[in-house]
């Protein structure tokens, strides 16, 4: 499935019966969350609210509410095909030297395709068909959702934030929630280790006191949005990766007020600056944990300019206790992670991030164990190899006879193959999600690894239990007789 922009994607989803237009007036304050939540839990379609109460701008919700739609957004026809994307990323992250001329020739098309996907910069773009500046800027015209009863106010959720560090050519794309606090001001809630926050910190060090340019694209095409949340190697820009997913180069346009480049087909772009030292209290908001987060201070983004398409579509979502849209994204992106991990750790058979664990706080790994202590090496590798797992609190490692995605199997392995003292690894003072109020200090907490593998000599002095296995001949005979027994 290929598409040129968000509108093309919407049209193709509608042709497939995977998008529903809602013509009944629905309020962005609480009501859209209720409708989207019920639809997502029923594995229903994407929703285009054509008459949001109090606004004349349609709202797109539940766009990535099923793993299948995430796959379509990444240019794949099914979720299983996402493993191929993971294999490509693994090759780009850790390229292997060719084994000979034939191997080099075979790999050449892949690298040539990557090199050919550099973004294309346009002079004119749909996202700049309408320009509002200065006193004409009014974020109150956007149908920004207020998702939960305890939320402090409207929250921009699907904004693609574009930044650049002072010493970098490559731009960073990140998705950070933004609390609307005024006609032209939002709070930029980026965590300290995220790309945008790092770029901003470097800017403040090199240009103290000077305003920092930022742009936020709303309603970019799905490949660009999903490229921003995928573990793209540092050698590959998110824009180039989006081109690979889409099958053609990402088209960009230079912002009107800075050198930042934004997706040319975006529905809405917010341009402006962060004034160093201007901070505000952010929150509380209901979040993907299922709780309201505590109030914390973050930089204020002053919007100097809004550019947009004619009759734009506002793309939004809500976050709450799983399942929610981020959890569904996690289920799909899980398939991308597997080949990347297997490239570094070939002994890994499967890797699973349960959506119930907020899609990143717990991981289950199955592996082909080869020596004593092997499980501990793998769990430490999971924590350190990809920054996406920096906040994973629990890593469960077990043997390849266990289905990582079946809790009955996993719990059986934990309760029969673990000694709590010997097989539990505790690591203190590690990075933890700021939203994790269970940690004793904001942003710093502990991690637990559970070794639920069979134990080898050296790990135990006892004879290890032998698993019960059925007699295959008896199983075949009963299979043949089963229908005659009248049991079901």
UniProtKB/Swiss-Prot annotation:
It is a peripheral membrane protein. Belongs to the UbiD family. This is 3-octaprenyl-4-hydroxybenzoate carboxy-lyase. The gene is ubiD. Pathway: Cofactor biosynthesis; ubiquinone biosynthesis. Coiled coil: none annotated. Its cofactor is prenylated FMN; Mn(2+). Prenylated FMN binds at residues 175-177, 189-191, 194-195. Homohexamer. Keywords: Cell membrane, Decarboxylase, Flavoprotein, FMN, Lyase, Manganese, Membrane, Metal-binding, Ubiquinone biosynthesis. Signal peptide: none annotated. GO terms for cellular component: cytosol; plasma membrane. It comes from the Bacteria. Its main location: membrane. The active site is at 287 (proton donor). InterPro entries: UbiD (IPR002830), UbiD-like_C (IPR049381), UbiD-like_N (IPR049383), UbiD_bacteria (IPR023677), UbiD_Rift_dom (IPR048304). Binds 1 prenylated FMN per subunit. Catalyzes the decarboxylation of 3-octaprenyl-4-hydroxy benzoate to 2-octaprenylphenol, an intermediate step in ubiquinone biosynthesis. It is found in: Cell membrane. It holds the Pfam family UbiD. It catalyses: a 4-hydroxy-3-(all-trans-polyprenyl)benzoate + H(+) = a 2-(all-trans-polyprenyl)phenol + CO2. One of its GO terms (biological process) is ubiquinone biosynthetic process. Its EC number is 4.1.1.98. Mn(2+) binds at residues 172, 238. One of its GO terms (molecular function) is 3-octaprenyl-4-hydroxybenzoate carboxy-lyase activity.
């Amino acid at each position: 499935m290929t598409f040129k922009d968000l509108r093309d994607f919407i049209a193709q989803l509608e042709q497939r019966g995977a998008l529903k237009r809602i013509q009944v007036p629905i309020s962005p304050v609480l009501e859209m969350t209720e409708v989207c939540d019920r639809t997502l839990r029923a594995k229903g379609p994407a929703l285009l609210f054509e008459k949001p109460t109090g606004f004349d701008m349609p709202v797109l919700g539940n766009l990535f509410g099923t793993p299948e739609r995430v796959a379509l957004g990444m240019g794949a026809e099914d979720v299983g095909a996402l493993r191929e994307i993971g294999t490509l990323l693994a090759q780009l992250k850790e390229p292997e030297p060719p084994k000979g001329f034939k191997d080099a020739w075979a790999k050449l098309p892949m690298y040539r395709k990557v090199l050919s996907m550099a973004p294309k910069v346009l002079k004119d773009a749909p996202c700049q068909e309408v320009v509002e500046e200065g006193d004409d800027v009014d974020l109150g015209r956007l149908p920004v959702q207020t998702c939960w009863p305890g939320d402090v106010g409207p929250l921009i959720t699907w904004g693609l934030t574009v930044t650049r560090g002072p010493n970098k050519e490559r731009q960073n794309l990140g998705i950070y929630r933004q609390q609307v606090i005024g006609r032209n001001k939002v709070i930029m809630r980026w965590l300290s280790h995220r790309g945008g926050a790092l770029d901003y910190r470097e800017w403040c060090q090199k240009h103290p006191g000077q305003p920092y340019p930022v742009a936020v694209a709303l309603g970019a095409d799905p490949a660009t949005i999903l490229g921003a949340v995928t573990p793209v190697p540092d050698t590959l820009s998110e824009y180039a990766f989006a081109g690979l997913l889409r099958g053609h180069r990402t088209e960009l346009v230079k912002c009107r007020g800075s050198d930042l480049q934004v997706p040319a087909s975006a529905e809405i772009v917010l341009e402006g600056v962060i004034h160093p030292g201007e901070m505000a209290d952010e929150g509380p908001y209901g979040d993907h944990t299922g709780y309201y987060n505590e109030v914390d201070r973050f930089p204020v983004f002053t919007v100097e300019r809004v550019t947009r398409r004619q009759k734009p579509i506002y793309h939004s979502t809500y976050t709450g206790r799983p399942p929610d849209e981020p959890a569904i994204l996690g289920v799909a992106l899980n398939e991308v992670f597997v080949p990347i991990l297997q490239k570094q750790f070939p002994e890994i058979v499967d890797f699973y991030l349960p959506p119930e664990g907020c899609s990143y706080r717990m991981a289950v790994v199955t592996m082909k164990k080869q020596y004593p202590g092997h499980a501990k090496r793998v769990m430490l590798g999971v924590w350190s190899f990809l920054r996406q797992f920096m906040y994973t609190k629990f890593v469960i490692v077990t043997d390849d006879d266990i289905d990582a995605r079946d809790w009955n199997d996993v719990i059986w392995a934990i309760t029969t193959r673990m000694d709590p003292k010997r097989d539990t690894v505790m690591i203190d003072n590690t990075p933890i999600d700021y939203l994790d109020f269970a940690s004793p200090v904001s942003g710093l907490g502990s991690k637990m690894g559970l070794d639920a593998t069979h134990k080898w000599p050296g790990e135990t002095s006892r004879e290890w239990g032998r698993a019960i296995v059925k007699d295959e001949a008896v199983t075949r005979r009963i299979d043949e007789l089963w229908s005659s027994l009248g049991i079901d």
